[in-house]
Amino acid sequence: MLAPEAWLGYWQGTADQPPVPVRPASVAAAYRRRLVEAEVAAAALAAGAPYPVAAAGGDGWGVGQTLTARGVLTHAAHVAEGRIVSYKIWAPTDALFADAGALTALLAGQQHASPAAARQALNAAVLALDPCLPYTLELQDA
């Protein structure tokens, strides 16, 4: 969901926490969401329509957002005296992998017969969240 005002407050220091990302409830839900987002993107391209964009700011502060196939992409800039003082990006991968919350939700309640099955389930969950960077899985037996 586009919410540039909430991000502006966070980056200006008037909010303690960034907005909470929407996390899928299951691996299947994550894939369904990605399919819907791909359909929206394809329809926009076919119609020659712009992709949704939102912005907020003032007094040298600005936040811009757009929807991507993997979620909301946010860019923020602070300009003072004609110079960029701060520039930040919050990508969908940041939102889903900044902590273990999304993966924990996708894997909650699962039990696996073997380390190989656990690795397969974890890999499916990571792929459902669609990171934009390469990743390596490391399992530690507890």
Residue positions per predicted region:
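Metal/cofactor-centered catalytic core regions of large enzymes
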Residues: 1-142
